[in-house]
A protein has these predicted regions:
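Periplasmic-binding protein-like
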Residues: 124, 182-185, 191-192, 225-248
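Extracytoplasmic ligand-binding site segments that recognize negatively charged/polar headgroups
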Residues: 28-39, 58-62, 74-207
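Short, low-complexity disordered leader/linker segments with a strong preference
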Residues: 1-26, 321
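A bilobed periplasmic-binding-protein/Venus flytrap-type ligand-binding module shared by bacterial periplasmic
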Residues: 127-134, 170, 240-252, 271-272
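Mature extracytoplasmic/periplasmic domains
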Residues: 237, 247-300
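Immediate post-signal peptide segment of exported/extracytoplasmic ligand-binding proteins
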Residues: 20-28, 43-49, 147-149
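An extracytoplasmic/periplasmic, membrane-proximal ligand-sensing/linker region
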Residues: 176-179, 280-321
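A ligand-binding cleft/hinge motif common to bilobed small-molecule-binding domains
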Residues: 85-89, 208-227, 276
């Protein structure tokens, strides 16, 4: 029996090595920030498979614009976005293929869509980020940020550039309507730019409070000693799975599937947590930030949010000007 098991194990290992050995060439991946994570994932995948990774890194808006420009001549195999609703839009447009990735049974419930086309390998949440020199203490709920004491101190990322903020605005409007966001806009809320520019405005003290700031940026900056703090308001926030997807036009489909498998590996998920993102697997926890179960959430109707997300993002920018 022992000899049989040894032979069986050897066969399994050889099969896995053979499958890996069959991979060659390259895979092209479009990924949002953080850039350090993208580089580490690419290096890890190449080390594991021998497949070269060509990358394009940008905001969700920049990635979508590039995909549109390349529509007649597809380059990308795998696309990762910071917006689940934009991933749903790609599926709706018939641009994705279905696949069952390795470790699918360990993925957080709901972070793989019903058609197995969107794979939430990580996630971020948005919260209230504040400069502790300008505002020493803060715990206000979203609606309370419209109070006169915060006039001229509010900023929000551009939801037409930030996928995370776009989904927050859609989720908040779908759940609570426009009154709170309009009141914050009337209180002088400004839009400095995408996530990085918006956080910079708070870090430098140009404004004191960032509404709907993406959390991993805050945790990373705090670890570097910046005078920042973050909390998730009691009214709830949007936790945004970051969908990795295989394009139906992928020139390197087998390599694309292998890359998706790698994203859910122990190694890749550890890299995710080191980048201050929430891991896509429920069996892996963070030690450097709040875990999923610690974050109050808005009940998200993603289909309803998809229907209003683009219009809501444009409207938010309009009322903040």
């Amino acid at each position: 029996m022992k000899r049989f098991l040894a032979i069986l194990l050897a066969c399994v290992l050889c099969t896995g090595l053979a499958a890996s050995a069959e991979l060659s060439g390259k895979v092209t991946v479009y990924m949002p920030s953080p850039s350090g994570l993208a580089d580490k994932l690419a290096a890890g995948f190449t080390a594991a498979t021998g497949v070269a990774v060509e990358q394009f890194q940008g905001t969700t808006g920049e990635i979508l614009a590039r995909l549109e420009a390349e529509e007649a001549n597809t380059v990308a195999d795998v696309v990762i976005l910071a917006s689940w609703s934009d991933g749903l839009s790609m599926k709706q447009g018939g641009k994705l293929v279905s696949y069952t990735p390795a470790n699918a049974d360990k993925v957080v419930e709901g972070w793989i869509d019903a058609d197995s086309m969107l794979f939430g390998y990580s996630a971020s949440a948005v919260g209230v980020i504040y400069n502790t020199i300008v505002v020493p203490e803060l715990s206000a709920d979203w609606s309370e940020l419209a109070d006169a004491q915060y006039a001229g101190q509010l900023a929000i990322p551009d939801p037409e550039k930030s996928g995370s903020c776009k989904d927050f605005v859609a989720g908040y409007v779908n759940a609570y309507g426009w009154d709170d966001l309009q009141a914050m806009a009337d209180n002088g809320m400004v839009v400095p730019g995408a996530n990085k520019a918006a956080l910079e405005a708070v870090t430098t003290g140009e404004v004191g409070i960032l509404v709907a700031g993406v959390d991993y940026n805050a945790y990373s900056s705090m670890a570097k000693g910046e005078p920042l703090s973050i909390y998730y308001p009691a009214g709830g926030t949007v936790v945004n799975p970051r969908p990795a997807m295989i394009l139906s036009t992928a020139p390197n489909a087998d390599n694309a599937k292998a890359f998706i498998d790698y994203l859910f590996s122990d190694e890749a998920q550890q890299l995710v947590t080191e980048a201050y993102l929430l891991p896509g697997r429920s069996d892996i926890k963070c030690e450097n930030r709040s875990n999923l179960e610690d974050i109050p959430q808005i009940a998200c109707d993603w289909d309803a949010m998809l229907a209003i997300s683009t219009e809501s993002a444009a409207q938010l920018n309009a009322i903040c000007k």
